[in-house]
Amino acid sequence: MSVLRFAILLIYFTLAALPLVWMGLTALKTNDDAIARNVKFIPSAAAVPTDSRRFEMTTQAWSNLQKPSPLTGRSFYHYLLNSVIIGSLSTIASVCLATCAAYGFSRFRIAGAKDWLFFILSTRFLPPLAVVVPILLMYRELDLTNTHLGLIILYTAFNLSLAVWLMKGFIDDIPRAFEEAALVDGYSRFSAFWRINIPQALTGMAVTAVFCLISSWNEYAFALSLNQGSEAAKTVPVYFARLQGQTTGIPWPTVADR
């Protein structure tokens, strides 16, 4: 049985890793080789028939990371740093707020708790594109356009509903007896929450953080519409969209090495 399990895991790992391996190999190709019909899976400088293209390893795509764009004067690392800052801070804020809210819904008697939870979840029903214009007008009045803070607040608000529901499920699974024992020993409610619930909910917080980070990292519409006329807070998805809009075609090696 162990051999069968190992074989199944090996097949699964191979299938899961194949796209990543191919993307890494594409990053070592030239633009012509990336779209050539006759290519080799393993990079090699060996000669191929004259009617085919030569497949050679190159670091041209990697060197493009440090080159500022002629249109914006910014390199890829600028957009990567923006994504890291905005994604990480919005994720931390979402998880912290959601954990506190989920603890309240899980441990206290709140009038209309089910209705409040449904209302929180219902904020996910509305497509984000439906509120781009009103949020843009509001952000202009608050002077939050072209800022990291504006996107952090927005992503935190959008991720909060999913985060609350996820964290409530994890906190519901933590036995109340642990907190009650801590309260009997003289712990305050906050101390019991901090010392008892948080350590046991770390797994749930990590899972919630992954979902929030993925959502913030991949968001495109607000990252573009709230950063018009400035590159200060634009993120990686906006950078990728600009690459795809080039008239010379999509530079697949440059896209792959990111």
Name each region found by the language model.
Residues R5-R258:
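A structural signal for multi-pass alpha-helical bundles of membrane permease subunits
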